[in-house]
Curated annotation (Swiss-Prot):
Involved in protein export. The function of the beta subunit is unknown, but it may be involved in stabilization of the trimeric complex. Keywords: Cell membrane, Membrane, Protein transport, Translocation, Transmembrane, Transmembrane helix, Transport. Belongs to the SEC61-beta family. It comes from Pyrobaculum calidifontis (strain DSM 21063 / JCM 11548 / VA1). Residues 56-58 are extracellular. One of its GO terms (cellular component) is plasma membrane. Residues 1-33 are cytoplasmic. It is found in: Cell membrane. GO terms for biological process: protein transport. The gene is secG. Component of the protein translocase complex. Heterotrimer consisting of alpha (SecY), beta (SecG) and gamma (SecE) subunits. Can form oligomers of the heterotrimer. This is Preprotein translocase subunit SecG.
Length: 58
């Protein structure tokens, strides 16, 4: 039987080579407060509900 390498401490996606992180500062993070995230979510939900009420499916 072939032995499998153990990647201890690594995320499975990183170990499989699906994600490559070459530099720590390479990825920019979006900083969003929890209140802003909830407000944006509620605004999107309200917009979708309003569109469904105003434009019902044929």
């Amino acid at each position: 039987m072939a032995r499998r390498r153990k990647y201890e401490g690594l995320n499975p996606f990183v170990a499989a080579g699906l994600i490559k992180f070459s530099e720590e500062g390479e990825l920019e993070k979006i900083k969003l407060s929890p209140k802003a995230a909830i407000a944006i979510s509620l605004a999107i939900i309200a917009a979708i509900l309003a569109l469904n009420l105003l434009l019902p499916p044929p």
